[in-house]
UniProtKB/Swiss-Prot annotation:
Organism: Escherichia coli (strain K12)
GO BP annotations, alphabetical order: cell division; division septum assembly; FtsZ-dependent cytokinesis
Domain of life: Bacteria
Motif window: Leucine zipper-like: 41-72
Domain notes: The transmembrane segment and the membrane-proximal periplasmic region, which forms a coiled-coil structure, are required for interaction with FtsL and recruitment of downstream division proteins. The C-terminal region is required for interaction with FtsQ, but is not required for recruitment of the downstream division protein FtsI. Contains a leucine zipper-like (LZ) motif, which is required for optimal interaction with FtsL.
Function according to Swiss-Prot or TrEMBL: Essential cell division protein. May link together the upstream cell division proteins, which are predominantly cytoplasmic, with the downstream cell division proteins, which are predominantly periplasmic.
NCBIfam families documented for this protein: PRK00888.1 (NF002058)
Protein name: Cell division protein FtsB
Lineage of source species: Bacteria, Pseudomonadati, Pseudomonadota, Gammaproteobacteria, Enterobacterales
Length: 103
């Protein structure tokens, strides 16, 4: 009876070692779970970014207002008969506002 008990105990020790430290054990399981959680967070950020870009694409494809707004803001384009004015603050005011932003 003693040999059978020792054999079963040895098998139990080996199974416990495999469970905790072996390939695909508890340590690997927790590491993979952490990797999956990090990847899901990254995927959520990228999905939000993609949704925003698709919304902008739909807006650009469907509406003239978005095209006109981008043309005016980014390319400084105007309609015939319009005059484009860009208001630039004085250098002293720009320095003051930059100094306040750094505080």
């Amino acid at each position: 009876m003693g040999k059978l008990t020792l054999l079963l105990l040895a098998i139990l020790v080996w199974l416990q070692y495999s469970l905790w430290f072996g390939k695909n054990g508890i340590h690997d399981y927790t590491r993979v779970n952490d990797d999956v959680a990090a990847q899901q967070a990254t995927n959520a950020k990228l999905k939000a970014r993609n949704d925003q870009l698709f919304a902008e694409i739909d807006d650009l494809n469907g509406g003239q207002e978005a095209l006109e707004e981008r043309a005016r803001n980014e390319l400084s384009m105007t309609r015939p008969g319009e005059t484009f004015y860009r208001l630039v603050p004085d250098a002293s005011k720009r320095a003051q506002s930059a100094g306040q932003n750094n505080r």
